[in-house]
Amino acid sequence: MKRGCAIAVMICGLITSVSAASAADLIVQEPVFEPLPQPALAGWYLRGDIGYNFKSKTGGKWDFWNQFEEPYRGVDDTFNYDDFSLKGGASYGVGVGYRFNDMLRTDLTLDYFRASINGRTNCRSYVKSSHGLNPVEDNCHYEDNSKASVWTAMANAYVDLPRVGPLTPYLGAGIGAAYVKYDTWKTSEICPTCTLQSDKDGFDSWRFAMALMAGVSYDLTDQLKLDLGYRYLRVNGGNAYGYDEQDRQVINQYGQGAGADGPQAKDNGFNIHTVRAGLRYEFR
């Protein structure tokens, strides 16, 4: 009897060992999930904007060329504009950008606008006297008129602030370059006895530019945003126009000598305030 019990215990132990081993063999390993590859364009976005530039006042100066013979020939006075302004008008822009995370994004933008520019300078007292005018009265001034085409290429960075429903406010800043090209300048001397009318070739130049932005975007869809914002753009000063044909002449009615060359006038740059509306499409 004792021998039979021992054999039964051994058989039960063997069965238990085999069952445990089988159970170990049946342990299922947890699956390892690999992240799905991101689409090639994920994070990138395209943008397009239209805006309105408000009229902006600036400053400038121009040199008066004395046409008489040596030793008087040459620049003998420099006038500062009493009023120099860039008229308001539409602006247009496109850009491509990349979103790094929910807060930080950057883009490269190209913008264009064209605007009329006007300058006014009061005549000096000796100019008034030469026309037989009272030198202390406001009775004589110069007017300069042209148009300027301005392209800006900017690198910008933005911080998107916490969302409020479908709205995302943001702040931004940018640096870059502006290409300013003036049309022909029309100059007139305005007074009862004045007759001066002249055309002067406009200059073009590359200049440093910087910008500050603020605005809010509205989610039209998960990928398409309506952007409403404000931009302040600073464009550094540069050459505006050259001398007219009479100043460039070597021989004129007053004698002969070196003709004028190079820029006659320079502007002090522009401070441009713009309200803009645009669309931004983000790839996912």
Swiss-Prot record:
Q: Which InterPro entries match?
A: OMP/PagP_b-brl, OMP_b-brl
Q: Which UniProt keywords apply?
A: Signal
A Pfam family matched in the record: OMP_b-brl
Regions that span the bilayer: none
For this UniProt entry, which residues form the secretion signal? 1-23
Source domain of life is Bacteria
Family per UniProt?
Belongs to the surface antigen msp4 family.
This chain belongs to which protein, by name?
Uncharacterized protein BAB2_0314
What is the protein's species of origin?
Brucella abortus (strain 2308)
User: What are the leading ranks of the lineage?
Assistant: Bacteria, Pseudomonadati, Pseudomonadota, Alphaproteobacteria, Hyphomicrobiales
